[in-house]
Curated annotation (Swiss-Prot):
Its main location: cytoplasm. It comes from Alkalilimnicola ehrlichii (strain ATCC BAA-1101 / DSM 17681 / MLHE-1). This is Ribosomal RNA large subunit methyltransferase E. GO terms for molecular function: rRNA (uridine-2'-O-)-methyltransferase activity. It is found in: Cytoplasm. The active site is at K164 (proton acceptor). InterPro entries: RNA_methyltr_RlmE, RNA_MeTrfase_FtsJ_dom, rRNA-MeTfrase_E, SAM-dependent_MTases_sf. GO terms for cellular component: cytoplasm. The keyword Transmembrane does not apply. HAMAP family: RNA_methyltr_E.
């Protein structure tokens, strides 16, 4: 999600970013962000996206995950993307700009879906990180909880949910909540995640089964 971008004055981050293997690979492959390779690795292991599926991507900008999802669902599928930041159009992707914590963008997304059952909800949302864990962790968990609430509204039985989480307070309870609603919950830490990052991804499969 765009809100997590670092300040331009972070020289170290800029140097690391431009020399980063996954950034370079994304540029070569035509992906908008290194995050595309996180989803591709999870896809390789878990085969969560298939042709013809309906996918919702929360925290989508700049669109790396949308590119991967649109390629995999093909012409018979559909991808719906939401982010607080503007995002350039992508073929096969319906883009909505807005803050997911507010009601109006959520309603716009639900209206765009037109009641169609969703096969997969993706969430790469993260707050602006202050570097103060006691501040950042509750904000991150709040976004993960909102994404789960949304998934519970739109997923069809047997649907899947993939969300970014950060290790810290509230994560164990959140995982237990997933286990109550889904038949299987798996933790993934893609190689394209930065080594020093506390982020990982929870893949919850089999909604309501």
């Amino acid at each position: 999600m765009g809100r997590r971008k670092r300040r331009p004055g972070s020289r170290r981050w800029l140097d690391e970013h431009h020399s980063d293997h996954w950034v370079q690979q994304a540029q070569k492959a035509g992906y908008r962000s290194r995050a595309a390779f996180k989803l591709l690795e999870i896809q390789e292991k878990d085969r969560l996206i298939r042709p013809g599926m309906t996918v919702v991507d929360l925290g989508a900008a700049p669109g790396g995950w949308c590119q991967v999802a649109a390629e995999l669902v093909g012409d018979r599928g559909a991808v719906f993307a939401l982010d607080i930041l503007p995002m350039e159009a992508l073929p096969g992707v319906h883009v909505i700009q807005g803050d997911f914590t507010e009601e109006a963008p959520l309603q716009a997304l639900l209206q765009a879906l037109e009641g169609r059952p969703v096969d997969l909800v993706l969430s790469d949302m993260a707050p602006n990180l202050s570097g103060v864990r006691v501040v950042d962790q509750p904000r991150a968990m709040y976004l993960a909880e909102l994404a789960l609430d949304f998934a519970g509204q739109v997923l069809q039985p047997g649907g899947d949910f993939l969300t970014k989480v950060f290790h810290g307070e509230g994560l164990d309870d959140y995982r237990r909540d997933l286990q109550r609603q889904f038949s299987k919950v798996i933790t993934r830490k893609p190689r394209a995640s930065r080594a020093r990052s506390r982020e990982s991804y929870l893949l919850a499969r089999g909604f309501g089964l």
